[in-house]
């Protein structure tokens, strides 16, 4: 896990800041501590930014009866107590995907965590010390928080188990790193990403979803249906040989090429061209 986290620390912040994603927030700060800042998106939704991995972001989503926390950041001490200071509702921890900047040490504060089973391949390396119960999400299920429903949509690409969560009534969702926050590390392959982008863009258009809050939120870099469509087209172009991308000799994890278009990047390698 340390090696993987080092890789993320090396390539994600530099690439994102190079793309012009400077943190500029308009949301009101409701909690500020040494490890995380929480800001209020609306009356019952908050986003928290950790300080270790390119503003790794977690989201607290509250209903009338209970709340969910999407991701836990890299290392936020006493995260459970911090969250309890924001909402009085019981909180369930859910991961958008299993990577150490989203399921880091902070998950130890919670007795259980829900993940997409496809990311179990990452658990041994990236959640090695978790003693709680691991439970599985179901594609297409709806999480009822009491007066607020959250749709669960599997969106593989960044990882096999990347998952997006949608509040249809509010017109927005939360996508973790599925669409890259502007800088997508494509760990599966182009074909998988194409299908994910087709599915999500169709869903967003059908239900009028305006934006997806990403896993590294910096205030302006929300995912839109246009961006999702663009990513799918970029992946299709790579697969067909229409786009070649550029060599990225500093790329790690085998992602030694990068395609930059429409203000976003796809990091990929030979293994992803299928």
Residue ranges and their predicted role:
Residues 75-145, 234-241:
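Active-site HxH/HxHxD metal-binding segment of metal-dependent hydrolases
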Residues 1-20:
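Bacterial Sec-dependent N-terminal signal peptides
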Residues 70-72, 90-101, 114-119, 154-157, ...:
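Active-site neighborhood of phospho(di)ester-bond hydrolases with catalytic His/Asp-centered motifs
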Residues 167, 184-190, 223-231:
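Histidine/acidic-residue-rich catalytic or RNA/ligand-binding cores of hydrolases
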